[in-house]
Every structure is written in structure tokens, then in C-alpha cells.
UniProtKB/Swiss-Prot annotation:
Substrates-to-products reaction catalysed: alpha-D-glucosamine 6-phosphate + H2O = beta-D-fructose 6-phosphate + NH4(+)
Gene3D superfamilies the record matches: 3.40.50.1360
Name assigned to this protein: Glucosamine-6-phosphate deaminase
Known role: Catalyzes the reversible isomerization-deamination of glucosamine 6-phosphate (GlcN6P) to form fructose 6-phosphate (Fru6P) and ammonium ion.
Keywords for this protein: Carbohydrate metabolism, Hydrolase
Pathway named in the protein's UniProt entry: Amino-sugar metabolism; N-acetylneuraminate degradation; D-fructose 6-phosphate from N-acetylneuraminate: step 5/5
Lineage start: Bacteria, Bacillati, Bacillota, Bacilli, Lactobacillales
InterPro entries in alphabetical order: Glc/Gal-6P_isomerase, Glucosamine6P_isomerase, NagB/RpiA_transferase-like
EC number per UniProt: 3.5.99.6
PANTHER family, per database record: GLUCOSAMINE-6-PHOSPHATE ISOMERASE
A GO BP annotation: carbohydrate metabolic process
Organism superkingdom: Bacteria
């Protein structure tokens, strides 16, 4: 795991953009994408760039169960607003949170991941060191699966909803083994609220109680942190 410390999120996002641009130059065809506040400035850099994704595939980490793609709180809507409307891909995949058979949807998503191996996976990290919606205790061997969100994750995401009761209680997420299958992983973390999780990920034991700790065993992980998020490493 290579760590790059930057002054702030803006600088970190520019560094991440240059790395993504380089990987595309070297032939990357499939990007794994994340949502949330962490990658927003990276997506802004991409929108304002010369990059063309019309011959590339994107695969998102996760989606809430019960929200349509047109729901403003869905990750499908987030991606459309923040990236896809400006920079369309040849194909873009997100889990279908309205699938009638959620088990079949997870199997279908695994088939997509097998068909389009991810060259570069963009990640953030949760305060409890979750990646995707893989909460503490998730098996390192997990593939795409249905997740019951923890109270802490629901609370953290409630700021995006009118009231906490509106936050979905389940999501479909790529599993930890799914994430680890990416050829390269670029994880960004900014702000002091992420410092404990970053320290546990980098310096802690490799244990399923710290989902992101599995990244210690990946051959090519780049960690971009600002001074506050990287205070413990």
C-alpha cells in the first residue's frame, strides 16, 4: 500500500485524477466507481477534462434497496448528476435496488464483474472502516451481496435525506472479494473523522472486524489522505 499525503481534498482529488488519467493512457477499460462526498471533487475534475469514456465500462460499488434510479437519493441519480450526464460510458452498471429478486440481482452483478474485470477501483472509507457497504464482520470472501445497514451507517447517510426514517435499511454491495479483484485500487480519505479508520486500515490487524484492512494484502493500493485523515499513519 502506497500512501500519498496531501494538504486537502482539492489537492488529493487532483492527484487522483492524474493517476486515473495515467491508467487510462496505459489501457484501463473498466473503472469501479464510488459515491458519497469523497469522490465529488474527483468527478468534477473528470467532468472538466478532455477524457473520453465512450469506449469504457463503469461498475459502481453499491446501491440502496428500494430506491428507483430516478430517486434523488439513489446512487444511480448521484452518478448521473455528478459524472454520467457529462461523461457517458459505453456501459455503466449499478445494482438494481428495485429488483424483484434481490438474490438473482447479486448473482447477475457477479456475472458483470466476471465479464468486465475492474482495472481501477475508486474507494472511500467509512468511519468504521467499511468499504462499499461491507460493514465490520463481513467475510473477506464475500461477493456481491444484500446488506443490512448498521445504525452508524444509516445515521451517517441520514444527512442526505429529509429525515432519518427515510434512509433505506438495506443495500446491494460488491463484496470484499469483489473489490479485491480489481487490478488497482485508489482509496481517498479526507478529514479528521476518517483518521481512526485510516489508521486501522493501514496499521491494524487484518481482520474482518476492520473491513478495509484486507487492502493490506492487495498488490497495488494507492491511499490518498489529507493531513487530518492521515494523522495516525
Amino acid at each position: 500500500m502506497k500512501t500519498i499525503k496531501v494538504k486537502n481534498k482539492t489537492e488529493g482529488s487532483k492527484v487522483a485524477f492524474r493517476m486515473l488519467e495515467e491508467e487510462i493512457t496505459f489501457g484501463a477499460k473498466t473503472l469501479g466507481l464510488a459515491t458519497g462526498s469523497t469522490p465529488l471533487e474527483l468527478y468534477k475534475e473528470i467532468r472538466e477534462s478532455h477524457l473520453d469514456f465512450s469506449d469504457m465500462v463503469s461498475i459502481n460499488l453499491d446501491e440502496y434497496v428500494g430506491l428507483s434510479a430516478d430517486d434523488k437519493q439513489s446512487y444511480a441519480y448521484f452518478m448521473k448528476q455528478n459524472l454520467f450526464a457529462a461523461k457517458p460510458f459505453k456501459k455503466s452498471y449499478l445494482p438494481n435496488g428495485l429488483a424483484a429478486d434481490l438474490a438473482k440481482e447479486t448473482e447477475y452483478y457477479d456475472q458483470i464483474l466476471a465479464q468486465y474485470p475492474i482495472d481501477l477501483q475508486i474507494l472511500g472509507i467509512g468511519r468504521n472502516a467499511h468499504i462499499g457497504f461491507n460493514e465490520p464482520g463481513t467475510a473477506f470472501s464475500s461477493q456481491t451481496h444484500l446488506v443490512d445497514l448498521t445504525p452508524s451507517t444509516i445515521a451517517a447517510n441520514s444527512r442526505f435525506f429529509e429525515k432519518a426514517e427515510d434512509v433505506p435499511k438495506q443495500a446491494i454491495s460488491m463484496g470484499l472479494a469483489s473489490i479485491m479483484s480489481a487490478k488497482m485500487i485508489l482509496l481517498m480519505a479526507f478529514g479528521e473523522e476518517k483518521a481512526e479508520a485510516v489508521a486501522a486500515m493501514v496499521k491494524g490487524p487484518v481482520t474482518e472486524e476492520i473491513p478495509a484492512s484486507i487492502l493490506q494484502t492487495h498488490p497495488k493500493v494507492i491511499l490518498i489522505v489529507d493531513e487530518k485523515a492521515g494523522a495516525g499513519i
